[in-house]
Amino acid sequence: MAGDKDDGVQLSDYMGFINRRGFLRGAAAASVASFLAACGANAETAQTGATGNTYAFGKPLKAAFSNAGLGATWCAQGKETAERWGKWLGVEVTWYDGGLSIDTQRKAIDDMATKQWDFVAIQAFGIDTLVDPVKQMIGKGIPVIQMDTTISKDDIGITTFLEPDNILMGSVVTDALFQQIGGQGNVIMTQGALGHTGAQGRAAGFHQTLEKYPNVKLLAEDPADWDVNKVASLWEDYLVKYPAGQIQAGMFHNDDMALAAAKVIKNAGREKEIALVGVDAMPPAVQAVLDGSLAGTVRNPSSRIHWGAVVIGALAATGAKNIPKYILTDGPLVTQKIAAGLLFMEEQFLS
């Protein structure tokens, strides 16, 4: 297949090609011209490049991507999505793993900034930790797409920001949790990384909802930096400090952490007394909601954010002018009614 060739992915190789996990291969190519036209780019150029190849954006493009760390399933899903859409649309994606570490990601982005790209897309592990190399790339005329979290609190010339409403996500999933425990009891919040704007928003949403439930008491709120091993250690300590009957609920800033805590709680034989919720609606968490081991999760649409970054970055690299500075990418609270459909959309790299 053309996706394995060195000369780039061509739309003609994918038009009409359908398989179980990739019905989008034909549809994605067919829709790019309308995206380009809507953003003021030349739709005819999208169909045929200067060499006669039918690349989605007139020529093969090279992009660099980085998110917080592939140890998080949300980030791993995003990587798979960006690479898959890149193959469909003729964008060669090079990945720089953030390693769930400010220092690791900074070194990766410093290296990224030494090279030339058609566009880059970044989810920062911590706010204001990548400003200098990102400004260096912007100064070279490279469009920078910001994904999910804020790179800089100042305006440094980011092309656009694809972001979910983290406050809303934290609020709605916390409300579902408190309803599950009847509006009363003790809760623990396990945070992500304190410098991560997504985690900050989810914490704010949690506290907004907590204020509406006077009979719910917050026992502890500690960061685990998205690290499931830190989560396990924290919750082992909580279960010792707060004996049976003293914890009714746990809210986690992502699903990986919620599921890690669920294992610790189950090993202690306390799974029936503590309700848990997470954020991201990754497939294992959606299944956990369906089987009752999680009380809820809310979708942070990793696939939509990452394929959006591929498409919008390519638009910016090929002359689109009216790209908005902010694009909201919200997802729903997961219920039994929508779970199967959401899983299907994730499997197709859409949601």
Model-derived segments and their meaning:
Residues W74-W88, M169-V173, T197-V216, K230, ...:
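Short, solvent-exposed amphipathic alpha-helices that sit
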Residues G49-L61, T190, L194-G198, T209, ...:
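Hinge/cleft segment of the Venus flytrap/periplasmic-binding protein
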Residues M1-I18, A29-A38:
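N-terminal secretory signal peptides
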Residues A124-G139, F206, A220, A224-Q287:
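Hydrophobic alpha-helical
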Residues G52-T81, W85-L89, T94-D111, K115-W117, ...:
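Extracytoplasmic "Venus flytrap"
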Residues D128-L168, Q179, N186, G192, ...:
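Flexible loop/hinge segments that line or gate small-molecule binding clefts
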